[in-house]
A protein has these predicted regions:
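Substrate-binding/active-site clefts of carbohydrate-active enzymes
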Residues: 1-62, 343
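Short, flexible active-site loop motifs that bind/organize anionic cofactors or intermediates
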Residues: 3, 172, 338
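Residue-level preference for long, well-ordered alpha-helices that form the structural scaffold
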Residues: 10-13, 17, 58, 62-66, ...
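Conserved alpha/beta catalytic core and glycan-binding cleft of carbohydrate-active enzymes
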Residues: 29-31, 46-212, 241-312, 319-320
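Carbohydrate-interacting/catalytic domains
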Residues: 175-179, 188-198, 202-396, 401, ...
Length: 426
């Protein structure tokens, strides 16, 4: 930010910076250090015009001295502080920022996922009615999710200088929908692969932007919606720590599987998070203010599915429309899976299901599945039996049109037969 750049090729400069990092760990016992604007150090031409920088010995724009410095810093720091984290705020596609130095990486433990943050906040700031046009911003992050060890970050940078607090990024005018949308955003963030960083004040929905010259607006915790969001975040953190499926395989493709990432019109995503021991959680998230009942969704395996978390619970400020009964899957294809269940998806909501053993569920807890047409398509999302019932309600006392049509055809055939018989007789 207009400051001088260190000469990373000189031992005096490297020694000063490394000693500074070690001081924070030794004297202040910090849990970790974040390196700000790493890209400005890695590139010789960062923020410079043509003629203002000199290429490296290979003719490129990479700052080779800075690369060597990062490797030395991370190696020395980790040798003395094995449990302390080193995090890079790196906004470009520089390869191997995280990982083992022996493999050629810079040696950081984690990298801020700036791509996810920009895409996700852009998506969430859009009116829910138009989010389907930005649906790709929701799903794109999984294409590169395993290229680095990422942290999903909503930092101080996103809630200052006119960018609005998180609650005010939500576009709804209605206060209840605004908080519901924010709960959904955090629910998606916590179930998406990657570690989490959420800046202070955003956990209880502070309306004002953060300002370094004053404290947080703690008085807002006396308001109902802020209190309930605060409780939601507390319970979400408890759930996160309790469920290894949400964090154990963040950087392994085995830990995540899409169920449906193509429902742009409905703005719904569903996916599975998986633990090392094979335990699975089914996550369904809706980003529109539409209540969807009897919504058909494919499941990874047949059996019983119990809802263990729902952002729409009344204690969190929701309407209380939940999946209170255990869902039993049916052999009915959906989302390219042979088994499926019907669930209720709350408006602007996130729900999590666990596959449970039949022996652990009582008969009273189970929702008796309806007999449905196994050829039903995803777009219908309503059992055929239900459609027939609805049709009968709409037309009480009327004769079915198809039956009426068949009757007319039979009468016409009968008349033609009579004419032919009469001609033969004559």
């Amino acid at each position: 930010w207009g400051t001088y750049i260190y000469n990373y090729g000189r031992p005096q400069g490297r020694n000063f910076l490394i000693a500074n990092a070690l001081f924070w760990a030794k004297e202040y016992h910090v849990d970790g250090l974040r390196m700000d604007a790493v890209a400005s150090m890695l590139y010789l031409d960062y923020g410079k015009k043509n003629g203002e920088w000199v290429a490296n010995m290979y003719g490129g724009n990479e700052n080779l001295d800075a690369v060597a410095f990062f490797k030395q810093l991370n190696a020395v720091y980790k040798k003395k502080n094995r449990t302390s984290m080193l995090i890079a705020e790196e906004s470009t596609a520089w390869p191997m920022v995280t990982g083992d130095i022996k493999d050629g990486s810079l040696g950081f433990d984690y990298k801020w996922n700036m791509g996810w943050m920009n895409d996700f906040l852009d998506f969430m700031s859009a009116d829910p009615l138009f989010r389907k046009g930005r649906y790709g911003e929701l799903t794109f992050s999984m294409i590169y999710a395993y290229s680095e060890d990422f942290i999903l970050v909503i930092s101080h940078d996103e809630v200052v200088h006119g960018k609005c607090s998180m609650i005010n990024k939500m576009p709804e005018a209605d206060i209840s929908e605004k908080f519901a949308d924010l709960r959904t955003a955090y629910g998606f963030m916590y179930t998406h692969p990657g570690k989490k960083l959420l800046f202070m004040g955003q956990d209880f929905g502070q309306f004002n932007e953060w300002w370094e010259k004053k404290s947080l607006d703690w008085d807002e915790l006396s308001k109902e919606y802020n209190q309930k969001l605060h409780r939601y975040m507390k319970d979400l953190n408890v759930l996160y720590k309790k469920e290894p499926a949400l964090y154990e395989l963040d950087y392994n493709p085995e830990g995540f599987e899409w169920i449906n990432n193509i429902s742009a019109d409905e703005c719904i995503v569903s996916y599975v998070r998986r633990a090392k021991n094979g335990d699975e959680l089914l996550v369904v998230v809706s980003f529109t203010p539409v209540l969807r009942e009897k919504y058909k969704i494919g499941v990874p395996k047949a059996g019983h599915y119990k809802e263990i978390f729902n952002s729409n619970a009344k204690k969190y400020g929701g309407t209380g429309k939940l999946n209170s009964r255990v869902k039993v899957s049916q052999e009915s294809e959906c989302d390219n899976r042979k088994d499926s269940i019907y669930i209720t998806i709350p408006p602007l909501g996130m729900c999590i299901f666990r596959h449970v053993d039949e022996e652990t569920v009582t008969a009273d807890e189970i929702e008796i599945p309806e007999i449905v047409d196994t050829k039903i398509t995803k777009s219908e999302n309503v059992p055929k039996a239900e459609k027939v019932k609805a049709k009968k309600k709409e037309m009480p006392g009327e004769i079915n049109k198809e039956t009426q049509k068949d009757s007319k055809i039979e009468k016409q055939k009968k008349k033609e037969t009579q004419r032919e018989t009469k001609k033969e007789t004559q």
